[in-house]
């Protein structure tokens, strides 16, 4: 293609020193994974979670953009087991890439782990399920700790003395990256 035909096609011009313009690739994924999923929107509304649309839309925009990119990095740079420190002492530490912690912070901040327990009203489980669905599209590996955190709340509530100490941390929307 000539420079004129590239302009006519609306394609970007090659950078100085580049050999050609790349125009046959899909654009970067930037989408709202909630509002763009009509079946999900209808299901959330139909099963009583319509009151959470604004929150779901906000999280859908994150999962379809910045969290998607973080998810690629979290999967590219997998956790590393460090068995010993530089002096030879056994430490058995797992080191995570910063993208993992960023995804966890966003998931916890959105309430993926505790939305239904913090919003005890009709449709809360539906809204929480939609958050899980959105989160998994960006990065599924973090769903294990988020789901285990969600699942422990009823067990803690069964023992009020234990719940007093542990439940505030479990339901918190502040991520603590410490091991």
For the regions a protein language model found, what residue spans apply to each?
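Extended, charge-enriched "interface" segments that sit outside catalytic cores
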Residues: 1-121
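Glycine-rich flavin
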Residues: 96-179
């Amino acid at each position: 293609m000539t420079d004129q035909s590239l302009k006519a096609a609306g394609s970007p011009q090659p950078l100085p020193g580049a050999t050609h313009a790349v125009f046959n690739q899909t654009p970067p994924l930037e989408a709202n994974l909630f509002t763009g999923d009509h079946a999900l929107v209808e299901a959330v509304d139909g099963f009583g979670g319509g009151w959470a649309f604004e929150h779901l839309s906000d999280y859908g925009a994150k999962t379809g953009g910045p969290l998607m990119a973080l998810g690629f990095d979290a999967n590219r740079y997998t956790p590393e087991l460090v068995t010993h420190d530089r002096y030879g002492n056994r430490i058995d530490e797992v080191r995570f890439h910063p993208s993992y912690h960023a995804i966890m912070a966003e998931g916890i901040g959105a309430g993926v782990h505790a939305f239904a327990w913090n919003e005890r009203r009709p449709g809360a489980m539906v809204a929480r399920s939609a958050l899980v669905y959105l989160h998994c599209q960006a990065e599924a590996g973090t769903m294990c700790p988020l789901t285990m955190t969600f699942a422990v709340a009823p067990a803690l509530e069964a023992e009020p003395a234990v719940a007093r100490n542990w439940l505030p941390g479990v339901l918190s929307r502040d991520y603590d990256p410490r091991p």
